[in-house]
Swiss-Prot record:
<dbReference type="Pfam" id="PF16929">
    <property type="entry name" value="Asp2"/>
</dbReference>
<keyword id="KW-0813">Transport</keyword>
<protein>
    <recommendedName>
        <fullName>Accessory Sec system protein Asp2</fullName>
    </recommendedName>
</protein>
<dbReference type="GO" id="GO:0015031">
    <property type="term" value="P:protein transport"/>
</dbReference>
<comment type="similarity">
    <text>Belongs to the accessory Sec system protein Asp2 family.</text>
</comment>
<dbReference type="InterPro" id="IPR022267">
    <property type="entry name" value="Asp2"/>
</dbReference>
<keyword id="KW-0653">Protein transport</keyword>
<dbReference type="InterPro" id="IPR029058">
    <property type="entry name" value="AB_hydrolase_fold"/>
</dbReference>
<keyword id="KW-0811">Translocation</keyword>
<comment type="function">
    <text>Part of the accessory SecA2/SecY2 system specifically required to export GspB, a serine-rich repeat cell wall protein encoded upstream in the same operon.</text>
</comment>
<comment type="subunit">
    <text>Part of the accessory SecA2/SecY2 protein translocation apparatus required to export cell wall protein GspB. Binds the Ser-rich domains (SSR1 and SSR2) of non-glycosylated GspB, binds much less to glycosylated protein.</text>
</comment>
């Protein structure tokens, strides 16, 4: 088998002598502290650039890894949760490479999971409310709220019965199991459960397995881990009466407890089942911390990893995949406070101050960077293709920008509950009310804007009008084109701003 996973184990007992190693793994075992050079030599002889996973069952042997430190990828070191690092060099090493504490007692199950979780890349997508089919037997009120949700109100019956199904099946591979998450809100007077049918691969109707998941099961992401490949047919069942709002159905390749989308990836959830994804990469553990907010994207997961890693410093990727491709990082007080807390916690992890913080984004990401940048006093905020007036964007979509960004109306309704002029102004003011309370007197702003901007034509002028009278340092550059034009040049300017600030403010030279 080509491209096998390279697994390094350091400990007192060679696991490969006691358990069956999965076929897609090459196993390398070392024990003696005198073999530090041997690990490096084996990597050179077998042309191993890095190990897919490093399993350590004795933390005293961690110094064995110091010689290959430059070859270690964060989040790939796994050690027993029963052990605590006592020596400072070892504790810092584990922190520096984001080592994961796990249960090593069930070795066969751990290796089985790792064999499926250590794949390259990432994958996730969603089925929107537009992909739902309401059961013909339901006689209550039905309201389609665009990409936001499907709203049902009425009597669902005293027994569970199918209420909604999805038009498309999901592929569940035995090599890469999926995990699922359903957005919904409901009255307490009704109850839900999810029924999933595993349809035999190559068949149209042969059932291999049928599973039912209660609301309690759905409080966490459901991992569908089968040792066979099948297609998943999904039905939502309900009983009781009241109002039910069903949002997107998310499915992603699982990494079990080792991360979301990528090793170390995490998801912030609020009580409304809304999600924000985030991923921290430690870089060289030296200032600054760059927080990058993803742009609007239908594919789920993280963007910008390559760009940010090239800077060398620690960074935090934050992405929003609600509705069709994001709702600009706004949400409940609980969700927004969660985003602020995530940024603060990672500054504390690194021992950085607000003056060692940069927030940045492109397009939709500029909203998150400025909105949450207002909660700190960052060294810099970098915005390319800035968007600020979300209500105005939705209003323009009716006549001036039809079929270009129709989801803006769903975003307007999601955040204000309406689509009238008052709602437009309310959403616009939500940004500026917070922005104008912030102290940016010590913050550098880097702006790259489109001269023929068609989404939010006044965003750049509005930002400059506010920032000009303050003591803010401002760098800006205009590019010819509309909002979605010349992305290559915009990204070049985006990265140039980062490099200028890293060199001038932090003494980092590429």
């Amino acid at each position: 088998m080509k491209n096998k996973l390279k697994i390094l184990q350091i400990g007192s007992i060679d696991w490969s002598k006691e358990v069956v190693i999965p076929d897609n793994m090459d196993w390398y075992y070392f024990f003696s502290l005198t073999l530090r050079l041997a690990i490096k030599k084996v990597m050179e002889m077998e042309k191993i650039n890095h190990f897919s996973a490093i399993i350590v069952d004795d933390l005293d042997l961690i110094p064995d890894l110091f010689l290959i430190e430059s070859r270690i990828i964060p989040y790939t070191i796994f050690y027993s949760k029963k052990q605590q690092a006592i020596q400072e060099p070892i504790a810092f090493f584990l922190k520096r490479y984001c080592a994961q504490q796990i249960d090593l007692s069930d070795r066969p199950n751990l290796l089985r999971k790792l064999s499926k979780a250590l794949f390259r890349g990432q994958y996730g997508d969603k089925m929107t409310p537009l992909d739902m089919v309401v059961s013909p037997g339901f006689k209550g009120r039905i309201c389609h709220n665009g990409y936001e949700n499907l709203e049902l109100e009425g009597n669902f019956g005293s027994d569970f019965r199918p209420i909604v199904s999805w038009k498309y099946n999901i592929v569940a591979s035995k090599k890469n199991p999926v995990e699922i998450w359903l957005e919904y809100e409901k009255d307490l007077s009704c109850e839900l459960r999810l029924r999933i049918y595993n349809i035999q691969e190559g068949s149209a109707a042969d059932l291999v397995r049928e599973s039912v998941f209660s609301e309690t099961d759905m409080e966490e992401t459901i991992v569908l881990d089968n040792d066979f490949t099948s297609f998943l047919g999904i039905t939502l069942e309900a009983r009781g009466f009241g109002t039910l709002k069903i949002g997107a159905f998310h499915q992603r390749l699982t990494r079990y407890q080792f991360g979301k989308f990528v090793l170390g990836g995490k998801i912030l959830k609020d009580s409304h089942r809304q999600e924000i994804n985030y991923f921290f990469y430690p870089g060289d553990f030296k200032p600054p911390l760059v927080v990058y907010f993803s742009g609007y994207r239908r594919a789920e997961g993280f963007e910008g990893f390559g760009m940010m890693r090239g800077l060398g410093c620690p960074f935090l990727l934050i992405s929003d995949q609600r509705l069709d491709g994001g709702v600009f990082y706004l949400g409940s007080d609980e969700l927004e406070e969660g985003i602020r807390r995530i940024i603060q916690e990672h500054m504390e992890l690194l021992g950085f101050s607000e003056r060692e913080l940069i927030l940045s984004g492109i397009s939709m990401g500029t909203y998150g960077a400025a909105y949450y940048g207002a909660d700190f006093s960052p060294r810099a905020i970098i915005l390319c293709k800035p968007l600020a007036n979300l209500g105005t964007i939705a209003q323009r979509g009716r006549l001036r920008l039809p079929e270009v960004f129709p989801m803006a109306l769903d975003i307007l309704h999601r955040h204000t509950g309406g689509k009238d002029r008052e709602n437009v102004m309310e959403l616009d003011n939500r940004y500026w009310k917070k922005f104008k309370k912030a102290d940016f007197s010590r913050t550098i702003f880097g702006l790259a804007y489109m001269k023929e901007e068609d989404y939010d034509p006044t965003a750049y002028e509005d930002l400059v009008q506010y920032l000009y009278p303050t003591e803010t340092q401002l760098m800006s550059n205009g590019l010819s084109g509309r909002h979605n034009d010349d992305s290559t040049m915009v990204i070049n300017w985006f990265m140039n701003y980062h490099r200028i600030i890293l060199e001038k403010e932090f003494g980092r030279k590429k």
